[in-house]
C-alpha cells in the first residue's frame, strides 16, 4: 500500500467515526435497564453452563 492510500483510509475512517458519533444517541433509562438485565442474564447462563460442564468433566475424570 502506498502512503497516499493509507492516509485516505484513515481519513475515511475518521469520517465514518464522526458520522456514527453524530447519529448515535444516548439510550433512555428503560432501554439501558433492559439491555443491562439481558446482558447479565446471558452472562449468568453462560457461567452456569460452564460450571456444569466443568463439574461433569471433573466427575467423569477427563
UniProtKB/Swiss-Prot annotation:
Against InterPro entries, the record matches this protein to: Prot_translocase_SecE_dom_sf, Translocase_Sec61-g, Translocase_SecE/Sec61-g
Q: Which UniProt keywords apply?
A: Cell membrane, Membrane, Protein transport, Translocation, Transmembrane, Transmembrane helix, Transport
Q: Name one GO cellular component term.
A: plasma membrane
What membrane topology does the annotation report for this chain? Single-pass membrane protein
Biological process terms from the Gene Ontology for this record are: intracellular protein transmembrane transport; protein secretion; protein targeting
Gene Ontology molecular function: protein transmembrane transporter activity
Where in or outside the cell? Cell membrane
Tagged with keyword Cell membrane: yes
The UniProt transmembrane annotation reads 40-60
Which proteins does it associate with, and in what oligomeric form? Component of the Sec protein translocase complex. Heterotrimer consisting of SecY (alpha), SecG (beta) and SecE (gamma) subunits. The heterotrimers can form oligomers, although 1 heterotrimer is thought to be able to translocate proteins. Interacts with the ribosome. May interact with SecDF, and other proteins may be involved.
State the protein's purpose: Essential subunit of the Sec protein translocation channel SecYEG. Clamps together the 2 halves of SecY. May contact the channel plug during translocation.
Identify its protein family.
Belongs to the SecE/SEC61-gamma family.
Protein name, per record: Protein translocase subunit SecE
Specify the species: Saccharolobus solfataricus (strain ATCC 35092 / DSM 1617 / JCM 11322 / P2) (Sulfolobus solfataricus)
Taxonomic path: Archaea, Thermoproteota, Thermoprotei, Sulfolobales, Sulfolobaceae
Amino acid at each position: 500500500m502506498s502512503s497516499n492510500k493509507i492516509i485516505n483510509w484513515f481519513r475515511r475512517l475518521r469520517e465514518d467515526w464522526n458520522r456514527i458519533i453524530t447519529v448515535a444517541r444516548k439510550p433512555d433509562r428503560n432501554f439501558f435497564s433492559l439491555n443491562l438485565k439481558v446482558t447479565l442474564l446471558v452472562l449468568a447462563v453462560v457461567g452456569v453452563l460452564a460450571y456444569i460442564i466443568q463439574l461433569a468433566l471433573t466427575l467423569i475424570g477427563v
